[in-house]
């Protein structure tokens, strides 16, 4: 298994969104689509179980994961990914910005942590940073 290399450019054109709020999914799908001139493929999963099932059969360039999911914490999925697919980058997009949760997500293997409360311009800039190999962490969660 190859670990994720932070110096590698991340592909956002094939993204798995692990999010149980359909409005947030649509928002992120639109942001990702606006960033590319070519079509993008975004697949959504509304639970940990659904995400694991998709990840066992499909390839992605990036996983965007929420922390609060109906069947557990997105941090569990990040840890699972580190064992199953360590080269696949995972970024948290959550409304939970508590320092302890941010640290747990990063320790589990997330390469970035973004807050949903940011406007589309800020989230778009953070996603572009990820695409170029950056590892953005929202300042509100990095206190």
Residue ranges and their predicted role:
Residues 19:
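Conserved acidic carboxylate
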Residues 22-43:
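Two-component/phosphorelay signaling modules centered on CheY-like receiver
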Residues 44-62:
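Acidic, metal-coordinating helix/loop segments flanking the phosphotransfer/catalytic sites
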Residues 47, 73-76:
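Acidic catalytic/metal-coordinating carboxylates
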Residues 53, 75-87:
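Short amphipathic alpha-helix used as the core "switch/output" element in two-component signaling
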Residues 66-67, 94:
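Active-site residues of response regulator receiver
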Residues 102-106, 117-143:
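Short, flexible helix-to-coil linker/hinge segments that flank and couple to helix-turn-helix
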């Amino acid at each position: 298994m190859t670990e994720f290399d932070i110096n590698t450019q991340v592909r956002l054109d094939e993204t798995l969104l692990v999010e149980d709020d359909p409005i947030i999914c649509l928002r992120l799908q639109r942001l990702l689509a606006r960033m590319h001139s070519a079509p993008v493929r975004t697949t959504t999963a509304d639970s940990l179980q659904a995400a694991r099932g998709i990840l066992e059969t499909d390839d992605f360039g990036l996983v965007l994961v929420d922390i609060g999911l109906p069947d557990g914490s997105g941090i569990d999925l990040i840890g699972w990914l580190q064992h199953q697919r360590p080269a696949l980058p995972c970024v948290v997009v959550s409304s939970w910005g508590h320092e302890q949760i941010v640290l747990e997500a990063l320790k589990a293997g997330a390469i970035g942590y973004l807050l949903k409360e940011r406007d589309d311009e800020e989230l778009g800039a953070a996603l572009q940073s990820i695409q170029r190999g950056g590892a953005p962490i929202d300042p509100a969660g990095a206190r």
